[in-house]
C-alpha cells in the first residue's frame, strides 16, 4: 500500500486462477502492469462448488482452497470474511488466517443470514449496530499474534439504501475501534456516492486505507479512483464470470454437433494444457 499509488487485486477461486494472477504481466508503454494480490471471494468460492453465497461453505473448506493457491503463488491474499460470524467464532477465523499466511480479512457490518450485497434492497440486508460491529473488530484485533495481519471493515450503508453520512459515521467508529482500513461498497452505477464518501473520509483520515470493489461502476479508471483517495481496488468476481460462459459454450457446441471439433475454438490446444503446469511433462 505504501509502495504504490493503488494496489490492484483480482479474484482467485483455485490454484489455476492464482497462477494467472501470479505470472501475468503486460507491457503498457514504458511500464509493466500486473496484479498485486488475490481476493478469496466467498461468492466465487461458493458458486464454484455449486452452493449459494450464504456462508454455506465453512472455513475449513475454504482453507483447503486457499492452501492450493498458497502452494503455487507468492502474492498477498485478502480473504472475504462475509459477516465474520459470531464474535466468539471470528477470533478463531482470524487466528487461522493469520497462522496460514493470509494477509488480510474484510468483514461486512451485517447480521443474520448473509445475502450478496449486489442484491441491494431487493434482499433483506440487516446492518449490525455500530457498537456490535466495533466489538467484533476489537475482538479480532485482540486475537492477533502479530501486527502484520489486517482487519478491514466493510461498510454496507449505501447497499442498504442509507445516506453517505451513515457510512461515514460507521467508518469513523470502526477505525476508532481498531480497523486497519475501510471498504465502502455500493450498487450505484455512477460511483458518485463512493466518491463523496472517499473525499469526506480522507478529510479526517488521510492515511487509513480505503478499499473499493467497482463491480457496478466498472467504467471508472483506476487513476480516477486513486484521485479520490482509494488505496486498494478489488476486481472481485471476474475470473469465474469469464470462465463460466466459456465452459457453457464448449459444452453446448458438443451437444449441438455430437462431436468436439467445433468446440475447439473455445478451448486452448491440448498440448498447451499439458505443459501449463511445470512438472506435468
Residue ranges and their predicted role:
Residues 1-234, 242, 252:
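Alpha/beta enzyme core
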Residues 16, 238-281:
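Extended, intrinsically disordered, low-complexity segments
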Amino acid at each position: 500500500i505504501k509502495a504504490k499509488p493503488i494496489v490492484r487485486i483480482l479474484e482467485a477461486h483455485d490454484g489455476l486462477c492464482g497462477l494467472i494472477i501470479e505470472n501475468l504481466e503486460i507491457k503498457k508503454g514504458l511500464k509493466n502492469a500486473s496484479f498485486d494480490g488475490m481476493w478469496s471471494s466467498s461468492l466465487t468460492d461458493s458458486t464454484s462448488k455449486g452452493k449459494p453465497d450464504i456462508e454455506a461453505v465453512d472455513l475449513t473448506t475454504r482453507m483447503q482452497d486457499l492452501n492450493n493457491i498458497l502452494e503455487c503463488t507468492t502474492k498477498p491474499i485478502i480473504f472475504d470474511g462475509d459477516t465474520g460470524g459470531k464474535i466468539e467464532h471470528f477470533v478463531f477465523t482470524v487466528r487461522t488466517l493469520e497462522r496460514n499466511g493470509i494477509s488480510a480479512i474484510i468483514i461486512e457490518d451485517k447480521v443474520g443470514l448473509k445475502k450478496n450485497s449486489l442484491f441491494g434492497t431487493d434482499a433483506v440486508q440487516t446492518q449490525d449496530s455500530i457498537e456490535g460491529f466495533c466489538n467484533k473488530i476489537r475482538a479480532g484485533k485482540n486475537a492477533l499474534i502479530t501486527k502484520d495481519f489486517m482487519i478491514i471493515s466493510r461498510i454496507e450503508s449505501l447497499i442498504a439504501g442509507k445516506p453517505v453520512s451513515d457510512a461515514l459515521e460507521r467508518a469513523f467508529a470502526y477505525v476508532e475501534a481498531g480497523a486497519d482500513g475501510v471498504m465502502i461498497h455500493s450498487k450505484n452505477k455512477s460511483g458518485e456516492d463512493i466518491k463523496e464518501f472517499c473525499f469526506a473520509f480522507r478529510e479526517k483520515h488521510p492515511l487509513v486505507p480505503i478499499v473499493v470493489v467497482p463491480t457496478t461502476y466498472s467504467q471508472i479508471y483506476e487513476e480516477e479512483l486513486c484521485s479520490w483517495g482509494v488505496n486498494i481496488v478489488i476486481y472481485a468476481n471476474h475470473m469465474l464470470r469469464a470462465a463460466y460462459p466459456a465452459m457453457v459454450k464448449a459444452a453446448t457446441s458438443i451437444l449441438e454437433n455430437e462431436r468436439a471439433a467445433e468446440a475447439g475454438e473455445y478451448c486452448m490446444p491440448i498440448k498447451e494444457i499439458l505443459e501449463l503446469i511445470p512438472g506435468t511433462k
